[in-house]
């Protein structure tokens, strides 16, 4: 027997005044989905355990029967594997976004986010942005000194590989939670010495 699993990740959306305070899903003409719901089983599930931030990465593991407490090590490793990025067992993989920040004077950690995905940057623009960053001698030296490298993709999603990194005891905020507000709110929290390599440049 074959099963089709349809996950409406984020499909519910939010209520819109222009739709009579209905969500787009409530207002949509979706007879096939309504028929499946009528003939199937409709229920509520909690796919993100209370100890985890609510996100599709954790929810999808849970939906597929994988215990997040056992298997979840962050969004980065799963996405990198899906992109065909090969790493060693001793590597730590972090998802990094290209983003837009306020263009004003002041300390970096006090500046706010404008867009968590740099306006959905993609293609050659995304590749050029990362190439410009890593070509900077200071950035290149920093990455080398901390045994790090950046693996690029033609999207706003990039991946930081930290070879032999030790981040136990650190909490990393999901990057989409950083909009809006000062960027320091998404700096790693916990052991300051361990956090330093991730916020140094």
List each model region and its residues.
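Active-site nucleophile/metal-coordination loop of metallo-enzymes that catalyze phosphate/sulfate
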Residues: 2, 12-138, 161
